[in-house]
From Swiss-Prot:
NCBIfam families: trpD. HAMAP family: TrpD. This is Anthranilate phosphoribosyltransferase. Mg(2+) 2 binds at D227, E228. It comes from Pseudomonas entomophila (strain L48). It holds the Pfam family Glycos_trans_3N.
Amino acid sequence: MDIKSALSRIVGHLDLSTEEMRDVMRQIMTGQCSEAQIGAFLMGMRMKSESIDEIVGAVSVMRELADKVELKSLDGVVDIVGTGGDGANIFNVSTASAFVIAAAGCTVAKHGNRAVSGKSGSADLLEAAGIYLNLTPVQVARCIDSLGIGFMFAQTHHSAMKHAAGPRRDLGLRTLFNMLGPLTNPAGVKHQVVGVFTQALCRPLAEVLQRLGSKHVLVVHSKDGLDEFSLAAPTFVAELKNDQITEYWVEPEDLGMKSQSLHGLAVEGPQASLELIRDALGRRKTENGQKAAEMIVLNAGAALYAADHAMTLAQGVELAHDVLHTGLAWEKLQELGAFTAVFKVENEA
């Protein structure tokens, strides 16, 4: 199916099949469509609402075209990532959590990008921390296999996305592509925590990942609007495990945490986010640093559970708490900085 035929279908509020969506996405991602066609397609999809078949088709093409990271094993390798777009502008919780997860002995293949709508994306934060981002897939694999953690910069691994960049920027609205990033990890991880900007996406994205072969995934959205587990409100979870999807609410108290306001956790940019994370992963000298630490523990614990590194959510949170207080997570961040600095010298020689 070509994009003109797809537009005719979408105008009539008719869904595309998975194969039809694959055809259209392949045309978009290989530069065969005009910016006007891409913009119209994205807006039409949003107005119609994307079906599970359509998302599966789009994700499968993005995965095919990605510059993949080949790891020695995917057993228990986890990603913790969000769609963004929640408007809260709190510090980089999932990126900070990744270092706690790795310090707990669980392998992390972190996928992320620069900020689109927020103040600090995962790439912005890591760059502020002195971590070199422009790695080849082989270099990323060496980080992950050697240190237990590595970062895959989305724009490096999904270069075909450049064809949709202009229309996405000009539209200035959430589109299909906002939900594709967390579903297209270049290492092909089977364990994830995926935060989404609306509860309505939790079950559908769990079903998408089920169809694409994921093993254990938590798709989450908190009642206060965050695309991650929140200290301030219940969090809705669609959990894929043993090829079954279950849905439930989790209160912070269910996991041994105290409910509290998120006041003081919003940041104006990556440097402010880094300073808060340094406090949270270090001595927690400030009230906000302590609160940030608890937010990190909550989300890192969920990822340890998704990775099957803990038997229950509560056990994952307890393990994350113990690890954070050792200071090993901050050391892991510094290790990654030193490791990638060697690659920077190699790449720029």
